[in-house]
Amino acid sequence: MPRATALGALVSLLLLLPLPRGAGGLGERPDATADYSELDGEEGTEQQLEHYHDPCKAAVFWGDIALDEDDLKLFHIDKARDWTKQTVGATGHSTGGLEEQASESSPDTTAMDTGTKEAGKDGRENTTLLHSPGTLHAAAKTFSPRVRRATTSRTERIWPGGVIPYVIGGNFTGSQRAIFKQAMRHWEKHTCVTFIERTDEESFIVFSYRTCGCCSYVGRRGGGPQAISIGKNCDKFGIVAHELGHVVGFWHEHTRPDRDQHVTIIRENIQPGQEYNFLKMEAGEVSSLGETYDFDSIMHYARNTFSRGVFLDTILPRQDDNGVRPTIGQRVRLSQGDIAQARKLYKCPACGETLQDTTGNFSAPGFPNGYPSYSHCVWRISVTPGEKIVLNFTSMDLFKSRLCWYDYVEVRDGYWRKAPLLGRFCGDKIPEPLVSTDSRLWVEFRSSSNILGKGFFAAYEATCGGDMNKDAGQIQSPNYPDDYRPSKECVWRITVSEGFHVGLTFQAFEIERHDSCAYDYLEVRDGPTEESALIGHFCGYEKPEDVKSSSNRLWMKFVSDGSINKAGFAANFFKEVDECSWPDHGGCEHRCVNTLGSYKCACDPGYELAADKKMCEVACGGFITKLNGTITSPGWPKEYPTNKNCVWQVVAPAQYRISLQFEVFELEGNDVCKYDFVEVRSGLSPDAKLHGRFCGSETPEVITSQSNNMRVEFKSDNTVSKRGFRAHFFSDKDECAKDNGGCQHECVNTFGSYLCRCRNGYWLHENGHDCKEAGCAHKISSVEGTLASPNWPDKYPSRRECTWNISSTAGHRVKLTFNEFEIEQHQECAYDHLEMYDGPDSLAPILGRFCGSKKPDPTVASGSSMFLRFYSDASVQRKGFQAVHSTECGGRLKAEVQTKELYSHAQFGDNNYPSEARCDWVIVAEDGYGVELTFRTFEVEEEADCGYDYMEAYDGYDSSAPRLGRFCGSGPLEEIYSAGDSLMIRFRTDDTINKKGFHARYTSTKFQDALHMKK
């Protein structure tokens, strides 16, 4: 989020904020030695965050800044008085940058409609901005921490030594991880802040996909891990860099006490309920560290942040001397002001820098003309993990003293001044080359004597590969997360403690693809040398499976050629123990199976794991070869037990098909069947063709396998249990499997028999098998399907006239898309041709007459019917055409006195509405009449603010008209009437849960009648 460059934004408010003590419902302070390895998995991340300083559990939010109860006490905010409930759909937590404001202004989204989502039981998000108590009262313009200024007494909010340990949650992709690392390297490059992978540090940040969008606390919270939320649409470089600004200790720039001298807040343009985001801090309680107001700060809001409309300003910069208004809200890079503030906040040395290139050099200030007295410089050399740094001093002339007490250059093997010392140097003797054990070096120069020398000059080079003799670490391709360099060859020899194995897991993988990995590749071998057994030769974009060596050594080689370069790879290695080799075999009753980082127990055939995951009990499921029988959930007819996994494999004779009919069905579950479920597949393997995953209380339809095998799997979780299910299976011979059942065209298997069908343009002979040429008038009422010219795919016959009358569900337009088209060519299509009409017959307006070999563009009717007529003359014949008919929702509807129907989707009644639906209907009545809309059925995914799926009604022709309401759940409680002659209906769905939809009826009505009925 933007920052208050103020020291109170950075020091008084940052350093004065007390440490949280269980604020926001957090758990007890975790042990400093706690193991957070669970963060490698998504579920582990979410569970561990229950015990974190979680910004999504903050008392309130100030923009994307999380404030806890102690912050409120510091600001003297009485929640009951100063905070009010959120009353409108919130925009959600964004950083207020330019790119976000642009992305939030899609054509069909109003300023009041946008929102982020908060997770429910199924991990989905719900639209909300603030947790209770809500937003700051709009009347409040400033707030003040009325405590004595203590710039140095609250250092617990500053990260010690500028070192910020981090963990990246396991639910992020490789590209997202790369963005996080690029943003951290950006901060390191321009400041003296350092980000390190967390080992055993007590306080650290966790990149997590949280429910509150983009948000973070300001500064170090202390007492354990704290989350930095990178939620939906937050995984952009500038947004992550902005959030890291909060972690470093920055508030929003526009909240500085002196902001009114530089910008104007236009309050009438601010979305209702968002006024608190524009509060400012009080002068006298904060300090700006001597830095001027920074329009260019990455911590500044954009001009239209939280605006009622995209083109309305909420923050207007004042004109400069040339009459130009500065640009604000950039999310591209740190500004010079950001850099200066951070360097002051963390007391960065006046000289020195962070060096991140593969090669580079640096020297003492003034070299070779002499360095000044009392100089202090620090160079932080940081290359890609898995690389080492070779440092060479080529010139050395420093005042020499005993133990190099006065003037010296010091090199440490790590990221800070507490790292192991490689050497302290003075005098004129050039040191031997120094080599780091990892990817960082700390070089510090100090002078305190009055006798000065020329100084020193040093050059460094990153070398990839080498020996990695430790129990855990990280290896990345050179220059990761940026593209690796050409013509590289890196060899790593990993050795962990005796008695352990080497475990290797990949976080990201993107190496130039080739079928045999001939160009760029990563090679992994099970041992210490190139002659060791090959584990894998990897390239492409899929992460390799986890690797486990058979000894305590592993050999890796990365090679790139001279051309195409990709992002490369990032991998973690660690010591791995085989728990199954222990005397008790891990406590497993039957079999122990070692896994990377852990182990699991398994049971012999006919048994399954008990609830303790170690003991075995008689299994449910089994291998069934009977032609018919019954399958029930374990414990039937009582409730099934928790943590069960049952698999039935049903096998019938060849040429048979298996049908499964559920008689009783009652499982825990919601629409996504995440908890308890039954899966049915055609085949015996767990990845065979899936017919469906079922849960809840709705009985599935009869399922028929595609072969003579069927797999039925039942799973229950560790919580709610229900009655379960009872199903009957029966096998039937598939007469179509041999010689197509004797059918000339298509054979369709039915239970106990079969039937023949004919292709388009033919009808079934009375013998039930042969097909004869049929008449050519077709009526089509299916939602989608294929139609073709007669005799397709062969040439159409001469002297034929065929018609197709296509009708669709009320409120849905017919769409026709041609896959192939070849009809005798004529300039005016006078011979053979296809005509399309916008209605039910040839009296409707014509949409076009077509011939030749150019496919007509996809055509959409204005209503729910389309008429086609194909004509061929006596001479030339061609291949003809094939087209797909489908439907599109929305359009213009005419309201009349006679009642008409409107359905949410074309398959209403047969299937739930589809995901990502975008439908707008405009219903228009005659002059002097209004529109009356009543709902016969309404079942749309329910959410407090209708932020997922919803139906909206507007009193006019488009969304600029007054909105009559947004509805979800069970819908409107009464009829909807327009005040004018038109009504717009908008239907939107998201990408997950789908419901039945709605069925509405509309008619025209006199205005006075409608008003009377409303009364």
Swiss-Prot record:
Glycosylation sites: 171, 361, 392, 628, 805
Keyword annotations of the record: Calcium, Cleavage on pair of basic residues, Developmental protein, Differentiation, Disulfide bond, EGF-like domain, Glycoprotein, Hydrolase, Metal-binding, Metalloprotease, Methylation, Protease, Repeat, Secreted, Signal, Zinc, Zymogen
Single GO MF annotation: zinc ion binding
Chain residue ranges for the region called Disordered: 24-49, 88-130
Residue numbers binding Zn(2+): 242, 246, 252
SUPFAM superfamilies xref list: EGF/Laminin, Metalloproteases ('zincins'), catalytic domain, Spermadhesin, CUB domain
Disulfide bonds: 192-348, 212-234, 214-215, 351-377, 404-426, 464-490, 517-539, 580-592, 588-601, 603-616, 620-646, 673-695, 736-747, 743-756, 758-771, 776-802, 829-851, 889-919, 946-968
Gene3D superfamilies: Collagenase (Catalytic Domain) (3.40.390.10), Laminin (2.10.25.10), Spermadhesin, CUB domain (2.60.120.290)
Family matches, as Pfam families: Astacin, CUB, EGF_CA, FXa_inhibition
Cell compartments where the protein resides: Secreted
GO cellular-component term (any): extracellular region
EC code: 3.4.24.-
Residues making up the propeptide: 26-149
Cofactor: Zn(2+)
Domain EGF-like: 576-617, 732-772
Enzyme class, UniProt record, top EC level: hydrolase
Function: Protease which specifically processes pro-lysyl oxidase. Required for the embryonic development. Predominant protease, which in the development, influences dorsal-ventral patterning and skeletogenesis.
PANTHER family named among the record's database cross-references: METALLOENDOPEPTIDASE (PTHR24251:SF45), OVOCHYMASE-RELATED (PTHR24251)
Record's protein name: Tolloid-like protein 2
